[in-house]
Amino acid sequence: MYLYAWYVYVYYMDTIPAWALKYKTRGVYIRNVGNNYYAYRTRSRWVKEEKRTKTLPPEYLGVVTRNGIVRKDQVMGIRSDYEYGNIALLYGIAERTILPVLKEVYPYLYGRIINYVILRNIQPLPMKSIRYLYEKTYLSRISDESMSPASISGMLSSLPEDRSISVMRKLTEKGEYVLMDSTAIFSRSENISFLEPGHNPKEMHLPQINVMMLFSATRTMPTFIRILPGSIRDVSAMANTIDMAGVEKCVIVADKGFFSAENVNKLRKKHLSYIIPLRRNSSLIPEPDHFMGVFMYDGKPVKYWKRENDVYIYEDPVLKSEEEKDYLIRIEENKRSRKQFDENEINFGKLYLLSDLNEEPERVYRLYKQREYVEYAFNVYKNDLEADRSYLRDDHMLFTYMFLNLLSLYLHFQILNIIDGKYSVRDVLLILSRIKMYRMEKSEIMSEIPKKSRELVEKLEIDLDMLCKK
């Protein structure tokens, strides 16, 4: 009997979390049903005729939340509810990273800035719709900022460019490896003078701006953004951007179209390090001997050769097999010849990188592969700019818009770096949005926490009580 009671006690303590157990008082017990916890009071009465106490059905008290027991009559008195869990995660990260910097540089506008940056992470809506998202999140309960289109537009025009540059410089840590890449963003806005015809890899003849981004390879984090007229895309602009950011160790990570002897000489004259992929028919590629070693990348083996004439050679066996298979299919379809196969077989699965870095081959490979994260970040800008073009009345507003989106990306990558790939950042924020805060007539009560949301709260170590103290 005692052993059974002990097992019941241990099971009870293991299945009910500590925050719910604190509401277990004399005569009150907590029951776990699904993903929720409910409080009941034991009841009994003395039966005089039988001279014994008779147990009665328990009295239901209400749902157990982190803020207390919500009675049935209180639930009926809910005035409104707000998305809470996603705000708790983003605001908590912001408090540890960008918020102290914003308070220092923009002491009167940091509240509106951080609201905009957080809301862009939850859902990248056009500026005209941000207010409606703001009003359904808990941000509107802890902030008295107006997030109307007019207030956001006013913020874009009033943030001094030199102060925004100061914020970005503070986000770049001394001594870390920083990658630089650039891209063209197209728009038909008639208000922005930076929009000019220019060269781009897609050979699209549309007005464009050039965007240069610095990306911390050490922390996998975007840290600096600069916009330039569409016709400017040269090495001098890269050097000036690095000087503006105050970066010590920067590597230009280019695409295949960037390579030319002239561009490489310009980089060397400016003392800029570089990693440039070479086309497979480049005359700079040395004859490969026996491979030097193997390292693992993204769960796959990668072969590498000894660096020769500043050229690093790599081979992905999985990609090699896929390329060979594709080529053989083309031969069978009479789209390629066996002679072409023999000429190209040596290049299957190969990657050739030209770099002045004197680093281990694996290090150079990983630096180059981080370009994928930079491209990921650029896509956010390309997808969002057109929706807001009517609000961007001049070059200064465009710069501020890009700056604020960089801060939004900074928070995005903070989350990306701590999740294990099971969920995307958007998935994480959506799952956490199911944690609500209910506003009652005289108080606030947090909702029950669904299982997936609870798992993320524990994994990401989210402090759900933090915003309640604001």
Which residues make up each language-model segment?
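Secondary-structure capping and boundary motifs in well-ordered enzyme cores
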Residues: 110, 144, 148, 205-208, ...
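Dynamic "connector" segments at or just before major functional cores
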Residues: 1-179, 183-191, 213-225, 444-470
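An anionic, glycine-rich sequence signature occurring as long contiguous blocks
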Residues: 207, 224-227, 270-369, 433-470
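Electropositive, glycine- and tryptophan-enriched low-complexity nucleic-acid-binding patches
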Residues: 204-245
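Basic, amphipathic alpha-helical segments enriched in Lys/Arg and hydrophobic/aromatic residues
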Residues: 393-416
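Short amphipathic alpha-helical "interface-anchor" segments enriched in bulky aromatics
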Residues: 363-391
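Acidic, metal-coordinating catalytic cores used for nucleic-acid/nucleotide bond scission
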Residues: 253-262, 280-283, 397
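Conserved nucleotidyltransferase catalytic core and NTase-mimicking acidic/glycine-rich helix/loop elements
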Residues: 409, 413-439
